[in-house]
Amino acid sequence: TLAFGFDQTSIIFFGIAGNVVAGLGAAIAGRLDDILGSRTIIIASLIGLIIAGTGVFIFADQGQITYWIGGLILCLFVGPAQSSSRTFVSRFAPAGREGEVFGMYQLTGRALSFLSGLMWSASISLSFVFGVTSNNTVWGIWGLMLILLVGLILLLRIDPNPKINFTK
């Protein structure tokens, strides 16, 4: 069967469109990052991702148009979340220790990357527990939304102007 009703050609076109939209989102958010701050952009992006992901789930039965519109809205918020996250980390990094801080940032991301696949699969498995017999793949969205929600909650606890003392 086709995932989300996309054949191979549709996936390629969606991938191209998604990257263009994510790039536009990152460019626009880059300007706003300087005005509003990285934390604000990341929070707005996470909220946008959660709302768009929920919309994709709710309107999944509308077919491929849902995945095109909802997916591109998701892409619009992915770019800013990624770019502003790097800016946010750079503002925390003390002079001369940027390599260490970004190394830890990258290590943490790689160490936790298994969570998305795990939560995707667990959510799909949960759909069977609820007796869903068709379009189970869409349920994977809930696992990803949960990860984003946890990230949002953790980010809200971070002081936007930390007083970090990195002494050796």
PLM segments and residue spans:
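C-terminal ends and interior cores of transmembrane alpha-helices
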Residues: 47-62
